């Protein structure tokens, strides 16, 4: 008889433990959930050097199903560690879900930049390797850093226009919050 009592008590405690475990899982699934999406992809859409003005369009792609709110950008393009173009400023930009926007930058290039792009346009070199790095400040995820390597090429039939091809990209990384 004692054996039967112990078995029933053991079964009762096992059922109680199982019920408590199910209650914990149920409570955990009801709490707030943090959903992190994919960071945006940033690249050079096009570049031109016309009338001593360097124009660059940076394409920012939102690869998520929800809008992304950008508050600031810091983008720099370098060739052989010499600054080619860039932008660092506050920017209020909402990018709709699964879409892209472009940020247009115009500046007066230095003589070195003009000479580099002229050598590319005149086919003295086939391409110019570039390094694109920087960060975007988003409302949702804070500061996201990015880096990529690629090459600039002249656009056939369009003097003064250049296109880019990315050869190596690192996904944006969240900076550690202080």
Whereabouts are the PLM-identified features?
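Sec-dependent bacterial lipoprotein signal peptides
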Residues: 1-30
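Bacterial Sec signal peptide processing site at the extreme N-terminus
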Residues: 27-47
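Short, solvent-exposed loop/turn segments enriched in Ser/Thr/Gly
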Residues: 50-57
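Asparagine-centered strand-capping/turn motif at beta-strand->loop junctions
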Residues: 60-64
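Short acidic, flexible loop segments centered on an aromatic residue
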Residues: 65-84
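Intrinsically disordered, low-complexity Pro/Gly/Ser/Thr-rich segments with frequent PxxP/GP/PP motifs
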Residues: 82-115
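Terminal connector regions
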Residues: 111-164
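Short, low-complexity, Pro/Ser/Thr/Gly-rich segments in the mature regions of secreted, periplasmic
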Residues: 159-178
